[in-house]
Amino acid sequence: IVKIGLIEDAGNKEIDAEGNLVTPGWVDIHTHYDGQVCWDEYLTPSCWHGVTTVVMGNCGVGFAPVKPGTEEFLVQLMEGVEDIPGVALNEGVSWDWESFPEYLDAIGKKNYAMDVGAMIGHGPIRSYVMGMDRCQGKEEASDGEIAEMAQITKEAIEAGALGFSTSRTYLHRDKFGEYVPGTEATAKEMRKIANTIADLGQGTLEIVSDWMDQD
């Protein structure tokens, strides 16, 4: 938007918009382009519908941080929660990062048709810190693991992440029907991460919840 009001100057290019709605670009705050950003700089189909900014990393799933050898675990989370075919993710995701700041650096090298923002997901954080075998289910994270998760969140937001997302709904399951990491994380774990974000004075906290008593 360059100017608001009656515009009398002629533009270099004018489009007849009679009968149409003219709006600023739409901001889609809930997308799952976390993998697609690796191979599609147009981010279709959002670019077809007036969207000029997308936010990914929702629902506690994503692809960073990731330890070498655990990539397929994150693919199975995304495939189960968002029904994005694992074969497409395995073919297209480049995996040339480990930390979330490195992930931002990797996608920052591309020239997208719209602005892209990302949140860091609880699932990747928990699997990175606790391991694939322990991050799902009812096992509680230790104080040291909780501190490490909070530090990873802090470093991600300082590097440019828009915030942190987690899923606490039983509707979200991985490819094999298991609850995603963080579904039953303790209040202590959630408070530590939330307080870390609050201390930063920036960043959002997104929780997809079934509104159980603990929440």
Give residue spans per PLM region:
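Di-metal (Zn2+ and/or Mg2+/Mn2+) metal-binding site signature of metallo-dependent hydrolases
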Residues: 21-45
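A generic secondary-structure micro-motif detector
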Residues: 31-33, 93, 142, 183
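Flexible loop/turn segments at secondary-structure boundaries
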Residues: 34, 61-65, 124-127, 171-176, ...
